[in-house]
Design a protein with these regions (language model features):
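A polyampholytic, Gly/Pro-enriched intrinsically disordered region
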Residues: 163-169
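Short, charged amphipathic recognition helices of the HTH superfamily
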Residues: 8-18
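Inter-helix linker motif
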Residues: 141-158
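Short, amphipathic alpha-helical "recognition" segments used to contact nucleic acids or chromatin
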Residues: 1-8
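Short, charged, low-complexity patches
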Residues: 2, 103-106, 165
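RNase H-like nuclease fold core
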Residues: 20, 24-126, 130, 134-142
Length: 169
């Protein structure tokens, strides 16, 4: 239900979709209620304070997905930040939708996470996107940066003919 809603299926069409999946009744108001609950949970996550402990490591990434914006389904970058706390647990500490992965969008996203209390970072891990690396260096000054090995492997694999990929990677 949530995925269909995010992808732009109208609340009225959701009842038809639900019926085709074997759900006997799903009204437009129920879909709206579910969407509101989801919005509230995301809002809580995005505003939750992070000053309860120090966080050592931060992983930052983006993926493009279809999002519902102004009643339309459009492609946007969902940017995420996952941090490892001193208690040894990973937490999703940042989540947002942006139009592009520009330096300005990354800087605004990271500044929001920092303003909520993220501190103590030793290492940030991300892909080699120039705007992201610059934003990380500015927002988390003094924190070391490492290129994500998964992204590096994917980038290398894309540049090597596929017959040779298995031997090299």
């Amino acid at each position: 239900v949530v995925e269909a809603y995010v992808n732009g299926v109208s609340t009225r069409d959701m009842s038809l979709l639900a019926e085709s999946l074997g759900v006997s009744s799903l009204s437009a108001s129920e879909v709206s209620r579910l969407a509101s609950e989801l919005d509230a949970q995301v809002g809580e996550l995005r505003s939750r304070g992070l000053d309860d402990q120090r966080y050592c490591y931060l992983w930052v990434d983006a993926t493009y997905v279809r999002c519902r914006v102004g009643g339309r389904s459009v492609s946007q970058a969902v940017v995420t930040a996952i941090a490892l706390g001193e208690d040894g647990r990973k937490r999703l500490v940042g989540l947002d939708c942006v139009d592009t992965e520009s330096y300005a969008d990354w800087r605004a996203f990271l500044a929001t996470v920092r303003a909520r209390g993220l501190s103590g970072l030793v290492l940030c891990v991300s892909d080699d996107h120039a705007g992201l690396v610059r934003a990380l260096a500015e927002v988390f000054q003094g924190c070391a940066w490492q290129r994500c090995t998964v992204h590096l492997q994917r980038n290398l694999s894309a540049k090597v003919r596929s017959a040779k990929n298995e031997r090299l990677v």
